[in-house]
Swiss-Prot record:
It comes from Xenopus tropicalis (Western clawed frog). The lineage of its organism: Eukaryota, Metazoa, Chordata, Craniata, Vertebrata. Gene3D superfamilies: YVTN repeat-like/Quinoprotein amine dehydrogenase (2.130.10.10). Residues 415-426 have a biased composition (Polar residues). GO terms for biological process: cell division; microtubule severing. It comes from the Eukaryota. WD repeats lie at residues 18-58, 61-100, 103-142, 145-184, 187-226, 229-269. Belongs to the WD repeat KATNB1 family. It is found in: Cytoplasm; Cytoplasm, Cytoskeleton, Microtubule organizing center, Centrosome; Cytoplasm, Cytoskeleton, Spindle pole; Cytoplasm, Cytoskeleton. Interacts with katna1. This interaction enhances the microtubule binding and severing activity of katna1 and also targets this activity to the centrosome. Signal peptide: none annotated. This is Katanin p80 WD40 repeat-containing subunit B1. Residues 358-374 have a biased composition (Basic and acidic residues).
Amino acid sequence: MATPSPTKTTWKLQEIVAHGSSVSSVVLGKSSGRLVATGGDDCRVNLWSVNKPNCIMSLTGHTTPVESVRFNNAEELIVAGSQSGSLRVWDLEAAKILRTLMGHKANVCSLDFHPYGDFVASGSLDTNIKLWDVRRKGCVFRYKGHTQAVRCLRFSPDGKWLASASDDHSVKLWDLTAGKMMAELSEHKGPVNIIEFHPNEYLLASGSADRTVRFWDLEKFQLIGCTEGETIPVRAILFSSDGGCIFCGGRDALRVYGWEPDQCFDTVPVGWGKVCDLAICNKQLIGVSSAQSTISSFVVDLTRVKMTGCAPQGPVPAEMPISQPAPAGTSLRRIYERPSTTCSKPKRVSPTSDDEEKESRAEIQNPEDYKEIFQPKNAISRTPPRNSEPFPAPPEDDTSILKEPVAPIPDVVTPATSNKNNTEQLQRPPVAASTPIVCQEPSPVPAPQSKPPVISAARNEPIGLKAADFLPAVKTSSPTEVVDDEAVSQIRKGHDTMCMVLTSRMRNLDTVRAVWSSGDIKTSIDSAVAINDLSVVVDLLNIINQKASLWKLDLCLTVLPQIEKMLQSKYESYVQTGCISLKLILQRFLPLITDILAAPPSVGVDISREERLSKCKLCYKQLRILSPLVKSKASQSGRYGSAFRELHLLMSGLE
């Protein structure tokens, strides 16, 4: 019997241009694992199938960029929040808007549907959480307690609790019936990006910018576990269907963790970049990621992933469900019990007014896919519901198919028909024959002619740092045939200059490190500023920002001029460090500065007060200089536009 060719554990389904501008939010439908919703800076919400390149439906109505999107459990409703603070709820079966909800004063950062009621929770940059009754078109309750933006909201499986994660490093649990906070979980050392309830037990997982996933016992409200090993902030986590493990999507890999005891069961390399959301369907994990205006979908075969302390035994037969033993120590933990309700399906909400319906249109761009996905839900023949087939796994890459060696790429490539055909053949993704990609012709995104204003820190290749940037421009002759000596010379070009740059940076860091070892942070910052190398200042601030107690008023006076340079830098990492540092200064010292400046003069001579007053005046002056810069960048789109809008909100007291 011939041995079947091995198939891949992970593979890429497709990559599509989702919006005409940057993609700001991507979410998967958790029920089917087949629907994707994207929100963009073009103020639209687009619906996609994870394995088809055509947009199913485009929802309009928002007048500002969409910041967050969320499906309900049945994938019949979708809610989207915008930068202006408004929410819009659409009925996907009827292809029309249901509600427009207004009330937040800033960006809507997080959303979640109640598991079986007509309620939506929203968290905002204004630090407030609001519970909305979609049927009655109003705010039911407002939860206050966070001091920074609310990044994630999740209802408990029984619908009695609401968990919120915030940039203030905390996770809060709210009792919906009592309308008050039950507990605050504050062990994280960085902003909390994502939270998920265990599907059965009283357990909560939270992922943070401190690169850890923490597990919380919701009976005792105590930390019971913490993972280590993530290299970037955690933004996507998902419990397995039976709750035996948790999946964590990193930049280059999918990690499978257990708790009690803490352990990493498996690490699966996946090249999905910035993963945004995860879902499980048919023993496959679906992941979606975004980069600028494009989104990509990936599949991980869970039958080949180790999800317990034992090694996987190969593909699982179709009739056997995937199951793992419960982690040790969890057998005594309570499980959720859904309270009895009169019906298993929420009552249909009447559509909103005609005026809002005209403003918020649902443009069905692919009628066939729309009818296939949404219309059969109203038919009797759909009982029991359809079971989608798993995506077929492509075979492992075989290098033997390369019959001819690849010729070296010349400096200038002239267009030719044969080259075009070869390119199309090489770029065809490994998709099943039942999912054609000829319905539309998304042209590849052309390389920008001008240098982008900000160079992303999340990239797969070096960008922006070229040795030629440090050398005078030299006119080159017309391209000729490259010989070996010229090729070697071209490869080594700029090497000496780059070595000098790196050697100088290492010398500067050694100088600052010698001062830092004495424990004088102010002197360390002064020496870094005196060196006149902004990269050294950025490295030093990245350490100081991790511990807010290190900040002092005289340190602010030195750092604020450097922050102005960082915010105007073309490098994303510099801008990010500048935003974090300025945010810490505004939160910790702006109230102190304004109080001291507003206080009446004291009687007599107080030297320490005079020094403090002088420092406050200088800091206030520098903050006033930064205010127009922050305001101008607050109108930008994308992730850093949101960060600058938050800074602008904090600086409103200066005006």
